[in-house]
Amino acid sequence: MIKKLDKYTYVGGTRYMDNGSRNYEVAGYRLPSVTTILGRTKDDTFLKDWIKKKGKKEAERIKTASAVRGTSMNKYLENYVLGKGYEDLTELGQETKRMAEKVIEVGLAPVSGYFGSEVTLYYPGLYAGQT
């Protein structure tokens, strides 16, 4: 089990959507998320080329499947870090469990402590995010 280290105090924040963009209200600031900033500043040439190559329908199917798999992985790994049991008996759940177990074996085995899970972090006046 990974121990929670109470070194930092985190300020709570509220996530909200504004015109399709993720934002946070935290410590009196209304801030764009890191995801929103990266989305607006990235070069999406490769992505557009990939969609053209795959076709819109197939690209959307792959994007959706990847997002669902990522959410499942996040849930499994978050519960592991928090020392909670979690089991998803669906086919996808069993697939992501095997993937998550590899991440735990290789990436989390040497980790003995963590400072926060799904906490809001921000830089006053610039951006916020949850990690």
Indicate where each model-derived feature is located.
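Metal-dependent nuclease catalytic cores that hydrolyze phosphodiester bonds in DNA/RNA
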Residues: 1-129
